Amino acid sequence: MANEQFDVTIIGSGPGGYVAAIRAGQLGLKAAIVEKDNRLGGTCTLRGCIPTKQMLMSAHVYEQMQHAADFGVQASAIQLAFGDVQKRKDKVVLKNSKGIEYLMKKNKVTVFKGTGRLALPGKVEVTDAEGKKQTLQTKNIIIATGSVVRPIPGFETDGAHVVNSDHILELKDVPKSLIVMGAGAVGVEFASVYSRFGADTTIVELLPRLVPLEDEEVSKELERSFRKRGIKSQVDTKLEKLEKTGGGVRVTGKTSKGEAVTIEAEMLLVAVGRMPYTEGLGLEGTKIKVEKGFIQVDEFQQTGEKGVYAIGDVVPTPLLAHLASKEGIVAVEHLAGRKDVRPINLRLVPNCTYCDPEVGSVGLTEAKAKELGYDVKVGKFPFSASGKARILGEEEGFVKIVSEKKYDEILGVHIIGPHATELIAEACVAMQLESTAGELGRTMHAHPTISEAVMEAAEGVHELAVHI
């Protein structure tokens, strides 16, 4: 049995784990990372953020080429080469994973391939694919094992006609028709992809609207845009039964009013969320508290066990790659004894959904702000009034700023439309620096740009937007 001594050992190499390892190396700590997959990067790099966004990009290019004539460009015989789409996706995934390997070497992080298990105090047991074990001596441990697809009883996947978000990334052909169960980020993104690739697509959502965690006006705009693109939305509906048919699947259910719903398609995508992955970690018998599957931590990501931290999808904060990365940095800086480490402000975590049109948001929705007792003022600017949006031919959507009347504090920003997932960063910076809506509106933005819509929405809080 080999013995190694580390300042910190991280279990999991996703965006939380590998970023934590890099920061540890930057601070001069001897760091190890344990990963059971053959490649580094976790769900985000291998089966999540990166491959899905690459497929979305391919779908966007395909759609743009179909509308080339709108820009005075004649293109004929445009065809989708789905096999090449998959090759491009795999190439980008591999490049990103290799990039993480390089960063581990650059920051002198030792990588162990295998499954990590806590052997407290101060040890991590690593078992490789052949069953060989070794023990790492470590002063601190960070659990960053991520999440897995949540199974739904009665809607078990088979990888053929009933698939999850992992399966649908590896399809050989585009299905003729697709039912998407769940209208969160994963559901609406894949609906956008496969609809643009030619699948007759229907989204079914239990709650009354698409992307139900977003501002209600954003949800309504997305449903309108989807309808325009031929994507059908069946909201406020609970699916109760799945049947296999000769050509695919049939799902049946009821709306909240008791109306029967039956939909048939070649394929069903079950996209109803993920659950923390803590299997085999050896948490039993420790002081680490687990509630509803999530590891409980304090503001610095510490568990109840001294020297053991947890970050990312295994803790009860939003399951977002960028949040996991920041949690990893907080954990490492805290265990390193940095005096300037600050807890994460969860009000300033951006949410991005890469459907078409894109959605980006940060902070409170209008409804939530009112519920919390704020005297709310709203500024809103449509992209239909943006010169740059007209140039792009992408005039759907708007920027909405929710502010507090007395102090002009920006409480939330909600964007649906072109480059929303990029624009939201400006809102995050403004809120982080405690900018008022007035100050944001007075900040000069270059013309013509999509970002001018943020400035105009901020001016709109005080009814001073110029171009509407």
Q: Where are the regions that the model predicts?
A:
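Beta1/beta-strand and adjacent pyrophosphate-binding region of the FAD-binding site
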Residues: A2-G14, V174-M181
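Short, acidic, Ser/Thr-enriched surface-loop or helix-capping motifs
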Residues: K113, D298-E299, E404-K405
